[in-house]
């Protein structure tokens, strides 16, 4: 077994503020003066389990509506506040943390309809803003969820563009609810094209060309949304310009198709619909439907939920799927939906020594491995032939390497103990990386040196 540690030549501490207002001794005096914490009464409640008495002296605190519990909470809050307020360095710590966190953040860009999009947070905004960038107009705010409500309680997620980039659909949540609506806009004019879809929960938005999209939800529960049981997820197809009541139920309408979570992916050529169905967050079944065949039959790829599987890319008539089926560290397989038997599966990226996280973009596959807590990224073609190992800026963590098949450049984010997250461009044909956006963090990583050191443990490993 390997052990390692990272040594840092210099250490930044919050007590290195410009003008600390009190010494440790002064703080200790003030904290002592703040007084001790209030006492908590012990009750006499006893439970008996299988003939054994189990005292539960604080059972009375479980009644959060009682006057005694309310009084106890008030006393605890008062005591805690007096303790915190007595820490004279607290304001300095607050200023330092605010200075280190209040800087502009940006995500790696993505493309839709040939237009570049990215998210940006100016520093302390509640929600990041979606921007678009064109050669003639430069950067423009495209969607700003901070303006969707006066009190900031409406959030945006799941932004998804149609194939040609002319339409965008996104989900809105009010007050943190899992029940959401889907809004559809015209990208050029910004106009909302139709009434929002409602009562959507735990859903993606997967477009089929420019005609409409697949989404998932449960039947609207009777009574409380917070306590009602939702255990049969259903996949629908919404055709643009039609009412939600006319949406086609694609999967999940029968007992045989009953699952708690159902999602959809469409292959790059629009031919195959791949449905993931699961009853937990680990393991899923996979079904495929040939949208060009005209029949509603589902082809079963993963018959049970013993492993995870998800569509990564499509290549000719083959589906490239990342899975840990018979491969705990993960692998990428090619499956012909017309020959779905596992004996016909082809390893594209076989299981290796390290856990695999695969992405696709620009007509290539990128295998991301975590090796001794450091990212290693290898580029393959869609047939599984290794192209190169990607040279990263330093020892650290890289993520991204995904995009459309026709993209000429891909983007990834890199960070480590010294480098705040920065965005790099990868030329997938040459394997060259260049800095695209440096971090705006005020943290000066050049003051530090990071090393990775290995040593033998007591048992010699």
Residue ranges and their predicted role:
Residues 13-16:
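C-terminal motif of bacterial Sec signal peptides marking the signal peptidase cleavage site
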Residues 18-20:
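Bacterial signal peptide processing site
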Residues 68-160, 171, 260-290, 295-314, ...:
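Non-catalytic accessory segments flanking enzyme active sites
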Residues 116, 165-169, 213-214, 273, ...:
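Hydrophobic beta-strand positions that form the internal "hydrophobic ladder"
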Residues 121-128, 149-153, 172-181, 196-201, ...:
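A flexible loop/linker signature enriched in serine peptidases of the S9 family
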Residues 131-134, 183-188, 229-242, 287-291, ...:
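Beta-propeller blade signature
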Residues 141-205, 209-210:
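A conserved hydrophobic secondary-structure block that centers on an alpha-helix together
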Residues 145, 187-199, 242-255, 292-302, ...:
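Blade-edge beta-strand/turn elements of extracellular beta-propeller
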